[in-house]
Structures are given as C-alpha cells and as structure tokens.
Curated annotation (Swiss-Prot):
Its main location: nucleus. The gene is BMI1. Residues 279-310 have a biased composition (Polar residues). It comes from Gallus gallus (Chicken). Residues 162-182 are annotated as: Interaction with PHC2. It comes from the Eukaryota. Keywords: Chromatin regulator, Cytoplasm, Metal-binding, Nucleus, Repressor, Transcription, Transcription regulation, Zinc, Zinc-finger. This is Polycomb complex protein BMI-1. One of its GO terms (molecular function) is promoter-specific chromatin binding. PROSITE patterns: ZF_RING_1, ZF_RING_2. The keyword Repressor applies. A motif (Nuclear localization signal) lies at residues 81-95. SMART domains: RING (SM00184).
Amino acid sequence: MHRTTRIKITELNPHLMCVLCGGYFIDATTIIECLHSFCKTCIVRYLETSKYCPICDVQVHKTRPLLNIRSDKTLQDIVYKLVPGLFKNEMKRRRDFYAAHPSADAANGSNEDRGEVADEDKRIITDDEIISLSIEFFDQNRLERKGNKEKEKSKEEVNDKRYLRCPAAMTVMHLRKFLRSKMDIPNTFQIDVMYEEEPLKDYYTLMDIAYIYTWRRNGPLPLKYRVRPTCKRMKIGHQREGLSNSGELESDSGSDKASSPAGGLPSTSSCLPSPSTPVQSPHPQFPHISSTMNGTSSSPGSNHQSSFTNRARKSSINGSSATSSG
C-alpha cells in the first residue's frame, strides 16, 4: 500500500501564480493555443502590445489575440481553495473598489465581480472556519431498515446522534481520540470514523472531507463511527526462526531415523494452538463484538477437526520422504 505524502503549497506555486504580476491567479484566463494561464487583467494588458504568449512565444492570433483566450473557472476555483484567505481578501478588495468608485459600471457584472459572494456561497472553506458535524454509531441493521423504506425513526436512533462544532483543520485522528476518551474504549479495540460506509484516513481534515464528498452546507457534516477488535498480526519472523531451529534439531537426529517412517514425522510446535482446543473470547467485557479474525471463527467445528487429524502428512528428511496418516 502506497503511503500518501503531503506537499507544501510552495511546491505548487509555479502552477498557481501568474508570471506577469508574480501573484496568485485572479480571474484565471488561459490561451487556447498553448494552454498557458495568467490573470485576466495581466494578459489583456499584455496582448495590447504583443500577439505572442509571454511564456512560449506561440502566436496567439494574427490580428485579434483576445479571441483566443478563455476564462478558466476550474483553475480559479482550485487556486481559491488551495490558498488560504485569497478568496475572502479578493472579495473585500472588489467591494472596497466599487465603494470608492460609485461611477464604475458593475451593473452587468456578476455578484462575484462586485465582491458580493460569501465563502459559503462559493463553497470555500478556510482552516480557521468552524464546521458543524453530526456523528453516530454505524449500524448495519439500520441501513437494512432504510433499504426497506422505513421512514419512521425511533427515539433510540435519534438519541444516538451527537452534534459537534470543530475547526476545519481538525483531523480524523483527533476525532478518533476524542471518541475513545469520551466513551472509555480500551486500546484493544479499533475506532473507525466513516462517511456513509467508507472509512476515512487519519490524516483527512474536516475541510478535506467536505471537499472530497462535496458537502453542500445544507446541514451538519454527517459522519459515523464503528468499534471493532484490533487485529493482532502474527510475527512471521519468530515463526520462521522456530521452524528453522526445529529443522536443525530434526536434521541432527534424522540420520538415525531415516529408515523409520514414524521417526520422520515433524513435531508440532507448542506455540501453535491445537485445532481441538476451544478458544475463548478475548473481549468478555464486549460480548456483542465478534472475535472473528481474518474471516474464520475462533472455535473450529468437528468436521474441521476430523479433516485436520485424518489428513496425511508428508515430510522429507535427508532426501527421504515419509508419509503418515495421522
């Protein structure tokens, strides 16, 4: 699994800044011949005296270069979302300009041109913004009931939901720690924060979640959580060492027992559980949580025991093979 890397905005500046003014794009405009982008006012002023791209010297148009430039709304939205405070400052500058120059004709312009668009309307989220969210326990049975088109909600379902107001820069990891401390969940259990049915990564911020899942601000950001036992990974290195040590011991004594089929049977390691030994639940204080690991139950059935004991085992010692029926 590839590890996600986070980059600084300074590494993206060459793709977000205008080479004519040295600032971030405002009203980003792209030349259709070479796809280089600039601020609208910068490129319009430049093309009054030149008909070539200021970066690659491609001819924009022989006589009317303004015909081959297009407004790039997608690029401008990316710049506004990546640069903190840029959209708010630009809207303030436009409002101040039209307030100082009432004679300026802005009647034909949009609300954004006049600086009358708020961050909420543009869906721009800043790091210091407070986001309202709701979080509730992820219940698979509840999803099945919704699939059966049952619209009535019981009081228990309504009370399960909690509402929080958090900074947009707060990460999923902080939210998991908050849930663990509030609910006194032991470290033997894993907490997953989810959006609908998809688990969220620890480094996601609330702002990332709002952008990724296109939160429309028509209600609190809906999040869910689930609690499950922590999967314990087996240490393969220690098992290999144990197998190699047992193999060395068998090879030392194998020369005396090479002719005997019974003597060639490998000994079972004492650290591995017997298939006939019942395994108790590791979490008696949470009986409702299953102790199933890796898709297999902790208590094997009788059929599995009989097939395990009746299976023929074959081992090779010093080039000779021995088979036993168990």
